[in-house]
UniProtKB/Swiss-Prot annotation:
Originating species: Polaromonas sp. (strain JS666 / ATCC BAA-500)
HAMAP family: Ribosomal_uS13
GO MF annotation: an example: tRNA binding
Keyword Cytoplasm: no
Lineage, opening ranks: Bacteria, Pseudomonadati, Pseudomonadota, Betaproteobacteria, Burkholderiales
Region annotation Disordered: where it falls in the sequence: 94-121
Family: Belongs to the universal ribosomal protein uS13 family.
Gene giving rise to this polypeptide: rpsM
InterPro entries: Rbsml_uS13_C, Ribosomal_uS13, Ribosomal_uS13-like_H2TH, Ribosomal_uS13_bac-type, Ribosomal_uS13_CS
Function comment: Located at the top of the head of the 30S subunit, it contacts several helices of the 16S rRNA. In the 70S ribosome it contacts the 23S rRNA (bridge B1a) and protein L5 of the 50S subunit (bridge B1b), connecting the 2 subunits; these bridges are implicated in subunit movement. Contacts the tRNAs in the A and P-sites.
Name this polypeptide is given: Small ribosomal subunit protein uS13
Disulfide bonds, paired cysteine numbers: none
Gene Ontology cellular-component terms listed: cytosol; small ribosomal subunit
Amino acid sequence: MARIAGINIPPQQHAEIGLTAIFGIGRTRARKICEACDIAYSKKIKDLTDGDLEKIRDQIALFTIEGDLRRETTMNIKRLMDIGCYRGFRHRRGLPMRGQRTRTNARTRKGPRKAAAALKK
């Protein structure tokens, strides 16, 4: 099993798909990494040589991924909340921040419905 950026990549997957197991790498970035390393997208992870894996690690080191990316995202949201802007306010209240309606729908952000009887008391 190949270990890249602290993540175990499933050996039976193709290189392009296997790289997407790393947070911060999607299909497009995985393809670009494979192109830069001269590796076929359809080549299985278990068939990659140690040299190929080292090339992939070097390419991935150029990007912000995994813990650093998660930390950066969290800090961006925290900054929005600290400066008190509209988006930060919506994050703090757990509501959608991109203009969606909230009178109905928005259940993903708001969570399960509260009982109507409990609200009237």
